[in-house]
């Protein structure tokens, strides 16, 4: 009897060790995906700020990997760009060499997006067929893969909005594109954090988990609002802080009819709402930190709340600086990257309240 119990215990320990090894491999893979997604969002921000997003006027998911390689091919690509309103109304007289500059930004963005698809799909297939992915994670990971494929379509849908009548992409489609990218990033972070070891600290308060979730959701919504700001160049409508043209609430916020359309199409209103969102996020993070420190100052959850508030504060400072400097490219990209850092940490903090995924003892290893 004792021998059987010992054998069972040894088998269990072996299974636990195998599970931990598998989880380390999955975490390493997801960390690489998260890093690549972060880089993609930064390149996407630079592509937008340099007004390069419409330089490639065709969607070629496979052949588009290869850029123009000869003078004739560059001339043909440039001729395609010369047909769209952005060239006619903004960049008339641009040379081929100047066109190459904006082309490379958009090409790099698309190439990196394709690369992330490979980085995600191939390891997913390998980990799946070798039994390294726990059953509870299979459907979520497939969902992320499907959302990533859909994001490619959304990207072209966004670009196509600026090829016929507009000189820039639709702010609605830009916001959709960026928000889906951030959803993919958040989902990967949620799973990654769930595979990491967690502390056994008690929650600082019963409301702490809900507050952490509210901060994460508000961070994502603020990114959506920021994308609307970017799509309308609303960051240039008021370049003063804390007042807007000398007022807390500027005039002309609801001049368009119906009134609700101002929230999406009036640059002044859009910037005002984005500012309000930033103040709300700052207040939520501050409240969460104070409540956590008062309830349980020595816990990991409380320490994370301090770091989260610090990140929100730094991001607010970057946003204000970007505004005052009238949105230079470097600061604009930094602000977009900072938003993703805040979102990622907010998601990890929220997931920390849930704890590690329970071990799936039914994992099957196959050579």
Curated annotation (Swiss-Prot):
Heme binds at residues 274, 335. The keyword Ion transport does not apply. Keywords: Cell membrane, Heme biosynthesis, Iron, Membrane, Metal-binding, Oxidoreductase, Transmembrane, Transmembrane helix. Pfam families: COX15-CtaA. It comes from the Bacteria. The chain crosses the membrane at residues 26-46, 111-131, 139-159, 174-194, 212-232, 276-296, 305-325, 327-347. HAMAP family: HemeA_synth_type2. PANTHER family: CYTOCHROME C OXIDASE ASSEMBLY PROTEIN COX15 (PTHR23289), CYTOCHROME C OXIDASE ASSEMBLY PROTEIN COX15 HOMOLOG (PTHR23289:SF2). This is Heme A synthase. The lineage of its organism: Bacteria, Pseudomonadati, Pseudomonadota, Alphaproteobacteria, Hyphomicrobiales. The gene is ctaA.
């Amino acid at each position: 009897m004792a021998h059987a119990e010992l054998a069972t215990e040894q088998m269990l320990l072996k299974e636990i060790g195998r599970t931990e090894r598998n989880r380390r491999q999955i975490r390493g893979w997801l960390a690489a995906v998260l890093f690549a997604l972060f880089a993609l969002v930064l390149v996407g921000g630079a592509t937008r700020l340099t007004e390069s997003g419409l330089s490639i006027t065709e969607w070629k998911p496979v052949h588009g990997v290869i850029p123009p390689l000869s003078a004739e091919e560059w001339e043909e690509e440039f001729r395609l760009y010369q047909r769209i309103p952005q060239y006619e109304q903004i960049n008339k007289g641009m040379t081929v060499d100047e066109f190459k500059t904006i082309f490379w930004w958009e090409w790099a963005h698309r190439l990196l997006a394709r690369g992330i698809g490979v980085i995600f799909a191939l390891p997913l297939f390998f980990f799946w067929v070798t039994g390294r992915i726990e059953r509870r994670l299979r459907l979520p990971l497939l969902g992320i893969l499907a959302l990533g494929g859909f994001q490619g379509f959304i990207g072209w849908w966004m670009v196509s909005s600026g090829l016929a009548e507009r000189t820039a992409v639709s702010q609605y489609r830009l916001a959709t594109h960026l928000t889906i990218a951030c959803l993919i990033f958040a989902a990967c972070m949620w799973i990654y954090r769930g595979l990491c070891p967690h502390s056994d600290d008690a929650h600082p308060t019963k409301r702490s988990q809900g507050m952490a979730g509210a901060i994460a959701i508000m961070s994502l919504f603020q990114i959506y609002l920021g994308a609307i700001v970017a799509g309308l160049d609303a960051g240039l409508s008021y370049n003063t802080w804390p007042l807007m043209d000398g007022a807390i609430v500027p005039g002309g916020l609801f001049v368009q009819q119906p009134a609700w359309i101002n929230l999406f199409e009036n640059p002044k209103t859009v910037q005002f709402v984005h500012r309000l969102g930033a103040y709300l996020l700052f207040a939520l993070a501050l409240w969460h930190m104070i409540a956590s420190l008062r309830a349980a100052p020595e816990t990991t959850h409380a320490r994370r709340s301090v770091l989260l508030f610090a990140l929100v504060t730094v991001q607010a400072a970057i946003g204000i600086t970007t505004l005052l400097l009238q949105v230079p490219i470097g600061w604009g990209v930094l602000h977009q990257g900072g938003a993703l850092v805040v979102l990622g940490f907010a998601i990890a903090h929220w997931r920390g309240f849930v704890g590690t995924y329970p071990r799936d003892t039914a994992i099957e290893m196959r050579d």
